[in-house]
C-alpha cells in the first residue's frame, strides 16, 4: 500500500541543515543535510510515522499541495510517497 503526504522543507540560514515537517501528522518532524539526505529522511520519517504511530497517521488526511503552498509560502513543499 502507498501513502503520500506533503512535507515542508525549510533550509536553515547559516547551515546545510534542512528541517522537515509533515504538518498533517502530529509529531512528524526531522532534519537532513543537503537535499538528497533530506529526501531520504523525509521518506524514512513518513514510513516510521505510519508504522510506529499507526492510529495518528492512518486517521490523518493529506492536505493538498496548493493549500500547503499558501500556508508555507517561503518553504519548499514536496509530496512524499512511500510503500508501507
Regions found by a protein language model. Give the residues of each.
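N-terminal segment of the canonical double-stranded RNA-binding domain
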Residues: 1-16, 21
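Short, charged, surface-exposed hinge/linker loops at domain edges
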Residues: 1-5, 40, 44-84
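Generic beta-structure capping elements
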Residues: 12, 23-25, 81-83
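A short, exposed loop/beta-hairpin motif centered on an aromatic-Gly-Thr core
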Residues: 26-37
Amino acid at each position: 500500500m502507498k501513502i503520500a503526504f506533503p512535507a515542508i522543507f525549510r533550509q536553515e540560514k547559516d547551515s546545510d541543515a534542512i528541517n522537515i515537517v509533515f504538518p498533517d501528522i502530529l509529531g512528524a518532524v526531522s532534519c537532513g543535510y543537503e537535499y538528497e539526505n533530506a529526501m531520504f529522511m523525509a521518506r524514512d520519517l513518513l514510513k516510521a510515522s505510519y508504522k510506529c504511530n499507526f492510529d495518528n497517521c492512518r486517521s490523518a488526511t493529506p492536505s493538498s499541495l496548493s493549500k500547503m503552498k499558501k500556508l508555507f509560502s517561503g518553504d519548499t513543499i514536496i509530496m512524499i510517497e512511500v510503500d508501507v
